A protein has these predicted regions:
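Catalytic cores of the polymerase beta-like nucleotidyltransferase superfamily
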Residues: 1-476
Length: 476
């Protein structure tokens, strides 16, 4: 891969690099910018991660740079790791001394020794991340590429600098990183490297769930996430990190009737949705929307394959999966549960005559997330029949139009009935009890069904009439 030397210089002419150069020469240490920042110069990608390796003490170099940057610089030293960080405004520099590493079989924590630049490049995960640019004045901007990282970028290839079995056994997270880079960059994984991932897949079990989720999130947020999940499936990692997604694979046939491969369908939905949103948790909703289909799959000789209530069962499965995978057990989880629970509703609406009542109930149940729900449901139309797709999308358009009209007229999104439980108890001198709940629910349903408008006077009159049928008399 050719890139003009002037282009390289353009990326390392800023004041921070000049200061690092001066400080390194004063300390008589070699200093290099290495890793992702250099890689992204050649890929013409913006990058804020600036990693500096010093052949000597990275901490001492960081201290010298911080002094030169003055009062605006904030220095953090991590002595146990032999690293330091310098922050000044938006600038963030990471410093480390060149080192060589070795690992024990059951840990990602390396045994670290001082080393040369070559040692440091040897320990890098992939050849494209082992590129280094010298910052010392006499060799300023000189590229050090011992493993053919530039050639691999030219060939769009992810490859390890050393024996991939050693690389992945030493640090199994690198298997996830290989797949993540391939997904983000649109690269291929070198066959020997990919085969080594398959051989070492079980080693992923020593990696913390949090680190795995960090990589999965980056895959989910990539332009075409299906690439990553296909690779995770093909190398055998997927059953270790997300067995419920892996369980969607396969097609079963009975009496000549088959069903679609729900794994392939899920990835197609995810890709389609990714074209319309960068919302991480909405994209995760695509991965979870059919997660209960294996548990609900039944064959009916009259109906064929059914997956009854897979949306409700899926909603109930989510907390256990989130807990196991160390996904957040907070509003984000509840949001995904809502998306999974409701994802069949707009499709049902689009497949039949759309009533005002059904629209009101959808607006009420989905609340502020109704637009996200519609995006998910539109992405869920993956039929190979173009006429069917066209019909569904046209019906979705009508659903959206009707939603807009009803929302403006009835204000039912996130609405609370105009009559509260407290007012019901006060009106009829009731303690907290079933009749209070029955009346409140009846008022809500009357509004959603269009029996009464979403207004206090109408709701109050409806309450009195319904209460009379329940032999309840107001005390005021």
């Amino acid at each position: 891969m050719y890139i003009d030397q002037d282009e390289i210089q353009k990326h390392i002419t800023g004041k921070p690099f000049q200061i690092i150069s001066e400080a390194a020469d004063e300390l008589s240490v070699e200093a290099y910018v290495i890793g992702g920042y250099v890689r992204d110069i050649f890929l013409y990608r913006p990058s804020k991660d600036i990693d500096i390796v010093a052949v000597g003490s990275g901490i001492e170099l960081a201290k010298a740079v911080a002094r030169k940057l003055g009062n605006r610089a904030h220095l953090s030293v991590f002595k146990n790791f032999g690293t330091a960080q310098v922050k000044a405004g938006d600038l963030e520099l990471e410093f480390v001394g060149a080192r060589k590493e070795s690992y024990s079989h059951d840990s990602r924590k390396p045994i670290v020794e001082d080393g040369t630049l070559e040692d440091d490049q040897n320990r890098r995960d992939f050849t494209i991340n082992a590129l280094a640019l010298c910052l010392n004045r006499d060799r300023y901007g000189e590229l050090v590429d011992p493993f053919g990282g530039l050639d691999d970028m030219e060939e769009l290839t992810i490859r390890t600098p050393l024996d991939p079995d050693i690389t992945f056994s030493d640090d199994p997270l690198r298997m996830m990183r290989a797949i993540r880079f391939a997904t983000q960059l649109g690269f291929f994984i070198d066959p020997d490297t990919f085969d080594a991932i398959a051989r070492n897949k079980q080693r992923i079990e020593i990696i913390s769930k949090e680190r795995i989720i960090d990589e999965l999130n980056k895959i989910v947020l990539s332009p075409k996430p299906s690439i990553g999940f296909d690779l995770l499936d093909k190398c055998g990692l997927l059953p270790y990190i997300f067995p419920e997604l892996s369980a969607l694979k396969g097609v079963e046939t009975k009496e000549g009737i088959g069903h679609k491969d729900n794994f392939a369908h899920t990835l197609m939905v995810l890709d389609r949705l990714s074209k319309t949103t960068d919302n991480l948790w909405l994209r995760w909703s695509a991965l979870f929307h059919d997660i209960a289909k294996p548990a609900t799959k039944r064959f009916d000789p009259r109906l064929g394959w059914t997956f009854h209530n897979h949306n409700f069962i899926g909603e109930k499965m989510i907390p256990g999966i989130f807990r196991k995978m160390k996904l957040p057990l907070n509003e984000k989880m509840k949001y995904i549960q809502k998306m999974v629970r409701l994802h069949m509703r707009p499709i049902a609406l689009a497949d039949e005559e759309v009533t005002d009542s059904a629209i009101r109930r959808l607006l009420f149940d989905a609340g502020d997330d109704v637009d996200d729900l519609m995006k998910l449901c539109e992405a869920d139309i993956t039929s190979k029949n173009p006429d069917k797709v066209k019909r569904f999308l046209e019906n979705f358009r009508l659903v959206r139009e009707k939603m807009s009209v009803i929302e403006e007229k009835d204000r039912v999104r996130n609405f609370q009935p105009p009559i509260s439980g407290e007012e019901i108890m006060e009106t009829f001198s009731l303690p907290p009890s079933q009749p209070v709940g029955v009346l409140k629910e009846a008022i809500k349903n009357a509004i959603l069904d269009g029996v009464i408008p979403n207004e206090y006077e109408a709701a109050h009159q409806f309450m009195l009439e319904r209460a009379e049928r329940m032999n309840l008399k107001p005390i005021k």
